[in-house]
Amino acid sequence: TAYDFLVNNIDDLESISSQVYNFLYCLAATSNKKEEALGWLEEAVIIEGLWYRPEVFEDEDLDNIREEKRFEICSKKSEVRYLEALKNTKTVCTWTEKKKDRLVLALHGNQQNNDISKNYWSFLEDDKYQVEYIQSEEIDSYRLFRWEDKGSGPDQLNEVINSIDWNLY
C-alpha cells in the first residue's frame, strides 16, 4: 500500500514535514490502522509542535479516527497554534534591489514555502537573471503556505508587483 511504501522509505527523507505527517496519518487511517494513524498525528502535533488549518481535520480520510479523544486533543492543540500563526502571517518577497538585468518572480506551490520554491527555481539564476521569491500570507500548515484565488492571493501579488521598481529593468 501507499502507507507501507511511505513508512518503509521514511528514513530516506531529510526531515518529516507537516505535509508528510499528514500523508502518514491519513494513509494509516484509510488503511484501517487507527493506532498508527493516531500515533502519527500525536507525533506531529504533540511531540513536534506542528499545526494545520482546521479544514485538514475535516478530511474524510480521517473519519474512522475522528471520534477518538486523542484526535480531538490534537485537533484542538493544532487549532490554537493555527490561530496564533494567523496573527503573525504576512506576504514575504525576497526582492530588495536590482542585481541582474532580468527579473524572475517565483511563487511557491500550495503546501510549500520560499525555501522549497528555491529548490525548483534557483537553476534560472545566472549572469542575466535575478530570481526572487514570493511567499503567501495564507497559511496552510506549519511553515507551509498556499495561494487562494478567492482569498488574498491576488491582492498580495498586486502589492508585491507594485513594490518593485520596474523602471530599473
Annotate each language-model stretch with its function.
Residues 101-168:
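Serine-hydrolase catalytic machinery in alpha/beta-hydrolase-like enzymes
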Residues 5-6, 40:
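Alpha-helical solenoid repeat scaffolds, predominantly canonical TPR units
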